[in-house]
Amino acid sequence: MDQSNRYARLDLKEADLIAGGRHVLCAYVMKPKAGYGYLETAAHFAAESSTGTNVEVSTTDDFTRGVDALVYEIDPEKEIMKIAYPVELFDRNIIDGRAMLCSFLTLTIGNNQGMGDVEYAKMHDFYVPPCYLRLFDGPSMNIADMWRVLGRDVRNGGMVVGTIIKPKLGLRPKPFADACHEFWLGGDFIKNDEPQGNQTFAPLKETIRLVADAMKRAQDETGEAKLFSANITADDHYEMVARGEYILETFGENADHVAFLVDGYVTGPAAITTARRQFPRQFLHYHRAGHGAVTSPQSMRGYTAFVLSKMARLQGASGIHTGTMGYGKMEGEAADKIMAYMLTDEAAEGPFYRQDWLGLKATTPIISGGMNALRLPGFFDNLGHSNVIQTSGGGAFGHLDGGTAGAKSLRQSHEAWMAGVDLVTYAREHRELARAFESFPADADKFYPGWRDRLQRAA
């Protein structure tokens, strides 16, 4: 059934919809299946996403028609489809009237993903009007709070030197805590890897007790504050809260040095909101493991990593992994830096829409995946700043001299970039950085041709 006479209004102007402030706008790349017209399929998509179905129903009235989602722009050649969703469509809490991200997803990327006349459809951007934006929690904490704990400038404190304890599984509590202590002697921040929790060989309560002790010892030995991101991911809201409360109690006076990691993609919006609301004084670390199933450029359905990041800021993530923008081992490219800008800036341009965040606190980009001291300068050159949390697993513990030296090499790489000094030149007077060249020779040869001769001449 062609529903374009009801669910398509190509006379509507995007600027007018934004000025009106009553619609969430979504931009998709959509292709109909063979034999279906573009506008007809787009209208069916909008109907299925809002008030319609595949037939006219007798219960529809004038009010219902007033909250139809409307296709307002199409470009069949580029496969671009834009839809305006009235804000009245979205579900709100009965306890406080706040917005729910699950409702946003249910409408904009729900049943429409399984429609028989759609070959594929993927959301590439969305715009949230002020009246709806203000109903989301947004972050309560971000990197500025970490800088405060670390004793740095809270406006431009620079890279937080971090790691992920590897191997991601298989370490018992004491070896895990020992690895934490080793890294903390040179670095700032350690995160649980996403599957680490309460395995039978590494009970959470035992591991956390030992990690809290390792933090105290490292702080005493270095005179510097240290940070830990503990995984509280669980299916059950009560389990998440129980883990969080135990962790804070165990860290005691260092409770404000603790972030909570939640696997936000696999657990969904409910887990992120649980952590945000139950623990507003903790940095909420959004890990996105599994997201590539829908965000990868190879996947033509779902939504992009940019959209995932934007949703994370709405929900209240203090930080979210953003990949390495082509500078590490994970899928990505240099142009992905717009994702970081959308997380951190007061207003930012997306692929299709400019979003004003109206004072909503920034979300911190977390950089991980194949990074080491030699790759950092190029990454920072592309991004334009270094106000990120950077976590290197192999880049720290793959250092020939161990985790402490690996941490120091990462810090020295950042220092060199901040000073505008060539990395090989800086390495001549910084042993840990020099040894990073020997630790990662393939990267050294790729990014710094002739490094061996230059370092040997300095020696």
Curated annotation (Swiss-Prot):
Site positions for Transition state stabilizer: 329
Protein name, as recorded: Ribulose bisphosphate carboxylase
Modification N6-carboxylysine occurs at: 191
Annotated source species: Cereibacter sphaeroides (strain ATCC 17029 / ATH 2.4.9) (Rhodobacter sphaeroides)
Pfam families per UniProt: RuBisCO_large, RuBisCO_large_N
Active site: 166, 287
Lineage start: Bacteria, Pseudomonadati, Pseudomonadota, Alphaproteobacteria, Rhodobacterales
Role description: RuBisCO catalyzes two reactions: the carboxylation of D-ribulose 1,5-bisphosphate, the primary event in carbon dioxide fixation, as well as the oxidative fragmentation of the pentose substrate. Both reactions occur simultaneously and in competition at the same active site.
Name of the gene this protein is made from: cbbM
Subunit-level organization: Homodimer.
InterPro entries associated with the record: RuBisCO (IPR033966), RuBisCo_large_chain_AS (IPR020878), RuBisCO_lsu_C (IPR000685), RuBisCO_lsu_C_sf (IPR036376), RuBisCO_lsu_fd_N (IPR017443), RuBisCO_lsu_N_sf (IPR036422), RuBisCO_lsuII (IPR020871)
EC number: 4.1.1.39
GO biological process per UniProt: reductive pentose-phosphate cycle
